[in-house]
């Protein structure tokens, strides 16, 4: 599914739902007498009332986190600067949060903004993440906003064939540009990881090569860690 299509998928086709609520019709068999008023059916009126209050649940609950790497040297332990911001579990709550937070181009230098499945912390030490790894994409400064949104939509909309492998994503703002990383939980599962990498590129219409680094390699070798998979 193309990136723009995913955004449309997260909206609601009210016309189709109204048609279903009205019994699938749409045509009036009998002509109206002059001055006659068509009364709204009880089914349609009931549907319209529900549409205002009913929320559309996601496959998983997700949590937004914020971190500022420039403060880490002053912390007693790595990760203590992480802040849990907001947890959402419906389409409506996602948009409510997304529309009221800074997008990557507006974040301060050194900021890391995360969106992870609920109860998974964006740290290597988290039990779900411990044996995983990351796919990474690079962007020029101020150019990652749309790709970040489409990454979020692909994750929370369960667009990946191996969506259960995904832990979350993070956008990092640095002096040289911005990076988006997609975290997965089982780095050794090459078939799943390669599938995720290929689909991610497709969703974002991203043409450059992207690489996958194991968390174990990153912990041991830091910036010297090499890509295990490339797509």
UniProtKB/Swiss-Prot annotation:
Disulfide bonds join 129-167. GO terms for cellular component: cytoplasm; eukaryotic translation initiation factor 4F complex; nucleus. According to the redox status, the Cys-129-Cys-167 disulfide bridge may have a role in regulating protein function by affecting its ability to bind capped mRNA. GO terms for biological process: defense response to virus; regulation of translation; translational initiation. It holds the Pfam family IF4E. It is found in: Nucleus; Cytoplasm. Keywords: Cytoplasm, Disulfide bond, Host-virus interaction, Initiation factor, Nucleus, Plant defense, Protein biosynthesis, RNA-binding, Translation regulation. Residues 56-59, 66-102, 150-159 are annotated as: EIF4G-binding. EIF4F is a multi-subunit complex, the composition of which varies with external and internal environmental conditions. It is composed of at least EIF4A, EIF4E and EIF4G. EIF4E is also known to interact with other partners. In higher plants two isoforms of EIF4F have been identified, named isoform EIF4F and isoform EIF(iso)4F. Isoform EIF4F has subunits p220 and p26, whereas isoform EIF(iso)4F has subunits p82 and p28. (Microbial infection) Interacts with potyvirus viral genome-linked protein (VPg); this interaction is possible in susceptible hosts but impaired in resistant plants. This is Eukaryotic translation initiation factor 4E-1. It comes from Solanum habrochaites. The gene is eIF4E.
């Amino acid at each position: 599914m193309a990136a723009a299509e995913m955004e449309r998928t997260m909206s609601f086709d009210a016309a189709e739902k109204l048609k279903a609520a009205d019994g699938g019709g749409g045509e009036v068999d009998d002509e109206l007498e002059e001055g006659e008023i068509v009364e709204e059916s009880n089914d349609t009126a009931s549907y319209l009332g529900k549409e205002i209050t009913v929320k559309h649940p996601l496959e998983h609950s997700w949590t937004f986190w914020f971190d500022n790497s420039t403060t880490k040297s002053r912390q007693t332990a790595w990760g203590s600067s992480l802040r849990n911001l907001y947890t959402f579990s419906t389409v409506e709550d996602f948009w409510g949060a997304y529309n009221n937070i800074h997008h990557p181009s507006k974040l301060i230098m050194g900021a890391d903004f995360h969106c992870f499945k609920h109860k998974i912390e964006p740290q290597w030490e988290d039990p779900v993440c411990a044996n995983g790894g990351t796919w990474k994409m690079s962007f020029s400064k101020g150019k990652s906003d749309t790709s970040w949104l489409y990454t979020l939509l692909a994750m929370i909309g369960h667009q990946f064939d191996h969506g259960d492998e995904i832990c979350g994503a993070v956008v990092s703002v640095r002096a040289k540009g911005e990076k988006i990383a997609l975290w997965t939980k089982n780095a050794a599962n090459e078939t799943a990881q390669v599938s995720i990498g290929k689909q991610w590129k497709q969703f974002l219409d991203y043409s450059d090569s992207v690489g996958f680094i194991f968390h174990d390699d990153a912990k041991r070798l830091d910036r010297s860690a090499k890509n295990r998979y490339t797509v």
